[in-house]
């Protein structure tokens, strides 16, 4: 497998993502939640790093994204920002911090921006959270939208199945996508929707559309780091491509360490002072 060379070390900005869409350059996006992994991902040349509320699942062991708090998201965001020089860093607003009212939404977004120094925030939903989005945007905070399968609404959906297969839901998604662009979102994530629908949305919008389980006709792709590196071994949806099996490698390394300690092979003479 060839390794992409990073020729441009300039800081990635929201405007630069739009330029990438205009010239047909695909956008790479991956999650990170801590300093060490964020540093490696940034040095590898990732365009966008998402401090996702998926930390609730892969870092804290929760079944859904719902339990993670704003304080916890800020902790992860601060850790990532200390490591990143090039990538655009997006921090998710967690469940319950923007759905209630626009004043609460703005306060949440301001806390994230002030305390993490992130570049922008991401939130889920369309017309139903319009007021919150507009109020945050009026404060000069860039927003990435998120439509399709929105994990914070899992109790409403009841399942993580593909969304917008039916005509009515697809129509609403298209309307919401145009609305998010119209009111000022700089980019949009589409999760787990039919590839044809996602490609249509990407072609109709001027802002970048980044997909996860949304086919190849969008402007970029995002995956959860633990999934694509094979750390989260129990998760294997159709859209996921594994680029490593670190779960197996870590297990082997730990077992080798245990054996060396038990057998007194570690430390040897060269590993002592």
UniProtKB/Swiss-Prot annotation:
Binds 1 Mg(2+) ion per subunit. Its cofactor is Mg(2+). Pathway: Cofactor biosynthesis; (R)-pantothenate biosynthesis; (R)-pantoate from 3-methyl-2-oxobutanoate: step 1/2. Pfam families: Pantoate_transf. GO terms for cellular component: cytoplasm. The keyword Magnesium applies. Its EC number is 2.1.2.11. It is an enzyme of class 2 (transferase). The keyword Plastid does not apply. GO terms for molecular function: 3-methyl-2-oxobutanoate hydroxymethyltransferase activity; magnesium ion binding. This is 3-methyl-2-oxobutanoate hydroxymethyltransferase. Mg(2+) binds at residues 53, 92, 124. The active site is at 191 (proton acceptor). Homodecamer; pentamer of dimers. Belongs to the PanB family. It catalyses: 3-methyl-2-oxobutanoate + (6R)-5,10-methylene-5,6,7,8-tetrahydrofolate + H2O = 2-dehydropantoate + (6S)-5,6,7,8-tetrahydrofolate. Keywords: Cytoplasm, Magnesium, Metal-binding, Pantothenate biosynthesis, Transferase. 3-methyl-2-oxobutanoate binds at residues 53-54, 92, 122. One of its GO terms (biological process) is pantothenate biosynthetic process. It is found in: Cytoplasm. Catalyzes the reversible reaction in which hydroxymethyl group from 5,10-methylenetetrahydrofolate is transferred onto alpha-ketoisovalerate to form ketopantoate.
